Amino acid sequence: MRKVLFFAFALVASVLAFTSCKGNKIDSPIVGTWKYATDPAPDSGWWTEYTFTFGGDGMFSLLDVAHPGTEEVYDGFIWTGPYEINGDIITLHKNKMGEYSSGQTKYYDEFEPNDERMKFSLTGNKLTLTREYGTEDAWEEVYTKQ
């Protein structure tokens, strides 16, 4: 039941994010929903699931949810805002952030908007994002189109 509520919440949050403000029209294969999950931690079994939704209207949502070694959702965060693509760089303009816990979302009133730049590449139904792009701490995540 929690899993169903989680996915219903993700869908509603994405729709609200995309209809709340207008971004730039994006005509790219990146438009759609992409998922990535970390491997379970060896000591605790905890794992994290990331869901990016990129809309054709230039708006995105990123849902980051932790799982306690099971499919059960523990808690997480959601970011929304416009995005833009310039060559192989995608910039997320994070202008709203919320916390997801026990099936409910609470958006922060005092969230300082920030931008995140990532290098990306598309191969078939795989999206590779390089997070912390341009730093020595950079890492890659490979998302699958849903």
State where each predicted segment sits.
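Positively charged n-region of N-terminal signal peptides that target proteins for export
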Residues: M1-V4
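C-terminal motif of bacterial Sec signal peptides marking the signal peptidase cleavage site
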Residues: A17-S20
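Lipid interaction determinants
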Residues: K22-P82, N86-Q146
